[in-house]
Amino acid sequence: MSSSTESLPGTLRRTLTTSRAPAATSSQRLKAGYFVSNAFLPRVKANGIHDSASSQRSTTVASTTSTTADAADGSSSTTQPTTAADLPPVDNTLLPHRRRQAQRKAAAAAAAAAANGETPTPLINPDAPTADLAPDASSQLAAAAASAPADSLKRRLSSLLSLSKPRLTVLVVLSAMVPYALYPVPSFLTSSALDTSLAPSLSPLTLLFLTTGTTLCSASANALNMLYEPDTDSKMTRTRTRPLVRRLLTTKAAVLFAVGCGLAGTLALYFGVNPTVSFLGAANIALYAGAYTPLKRISAVNTWVGAIVGGIPPLMGWAAAAGESATGDGTWRELLFASDGSSLGGWLFAGLLFAWQFPHFMPLSWGIRHEYKAAGLRMLAWTNPARNGRVALRYSLAFIPLCVGLSATGVTEWSFAVTSLPVNAWLVWEAIKFWRLEGHKGSARGLFWASVWHLPVIMVLALAQKKGMWGRVWRSVFGEPEEEEGEWVYEDEDEEEGGGVGEVVKGVVKK
């Protein structure tokens, strides 16, 4: 019996042997590969390596042949042949199909660059978290500015707006607005029937000054960051299109924009909110531009300093709301360190944003760790990869007690501690995979996208379960009183007893 017959399953082999059927044609012959064997995955891996090697050899042969033909035709082009060695390196830890995809993209990019006489640019790791991300808002605005006429208003405005990192600024402003809305004001939807001063409510004007001032402070910090490191930005794929790298703006214009936004933002917070919030806004600029940015070249501790910067905006929102209902002199001690513990909610929100920076940034930096290293920026992703995963896991676990703390301090209902648990568990699970696999096999991508969705979901859950909000909504809709109160009546008493002076008691007015 032939070897091809021996490779078939036992039942089919016995049938073919006993029936003595004539040999099957090539179109009818069953192959052993039709039946999935236990060695399927090893064969796929081996085939992937073989295909990659074959594609590299074919690329080398094709480019060499093309170069030889050009030389024979007397071409004057000085373009060097594109070989596998000339292509950007591809991470060997990727899955086979990812590796082949990266090789094809690298070959196509190298061929296009060679045709245009340019130097091939390194490709982003296709397994990195940033592989599926669209260009950020700064890059899009810089591209729009570059396409506009040199002296046009569109070019100048787009370039200046690009300095502010719009998406990051929006996140900063939202992280200040949520604690402002969640501050436990005594009356959220209704005002006091007796004296509105006894039941303070959130002021739309204060919220306007808070958002405007925070936006300007964030824009100032981001512009100063770009002013400090245009040389390192030019070495990284995700930052090489920034306006100062592309010389869309002069350094003088960027300095004026940064200083102007910083002054306007702190003044708006000082006069429109309170001095404590203004100080926090100025401190945020100083820490981000004066400490975090220079530390990136010195130590991986820069990540912790950057996380502190991320935790300040929630404190700003909380202090802004606390200033409206302050019963004392409204100093920073009362707003941030109240003796009755009412400021704990603000610090818990600051802790949430501080902890969130690590499961978000660690997988993001892992995908471009080689670029960080080439640019001279010290990140745990390449200085200590094992610790990089441990840090992401450690701060992912911190979300569980922080969410419970918000319920325990009366900021949210206890249902928030329950509903936030599945979201926090999802983040922890992705962080465990990122730690165990050290970023490989898609674990970095999984944790990055989990962190992207995690924070807004937690914020929405907290807003939807603010302490006492739904009870007040119910009473406001159905007209039920907030508490049982006695009727206000007048009782006449003798002048000898009451002296003719009206005396107010709870539920009763004596006259």
Curated annotation (Swiss-Prot):
InterPro entries: Protohaem_IX_farnesylTrfase, Protohaem_IX_farnesylTrfase_mt, UbiA_prenyltransferase, UbiA_prenylTrfase_CS, UbiA_sf. It comes from the Eukaryota. Its main location: mitochondrion. The chain crosses the membrane at residues 168-188, 197-217, 253-273, 275-295, 303-323, 344-364, 398-418, 444-464. Residues 52-79, 104-115, 126-136 have a biased composition (Low complexity). The keyword Coiled coil does not apply. It is a multi-pass membrane protein. Its EC number is 2.5.1.-. Pfam families: UbiA. It is found in: Mitochondrion membrane. Coiled coil: none annotated. Keywords: Heme biosynthesis, Membrane, Mitochondrion, Transferase, Transit peptide, Transmembrane, Transmembrane helix. One of its GO terms (cellular component) is mitochondrion. Disulfide bonds: none annotated. Converts protoheme IX and farnesyl diphosphate to heme O. PANTHER family: PROTOHEME IX FARNESYLTRANSFERASE, MITOCHONDRIAL. This is Protoheme IX farnesyltransferase, mitochondrial. The lineage of its organism: Eukaryota, Fungi, Dikarya, Ascomycota, Pezizomycotina.
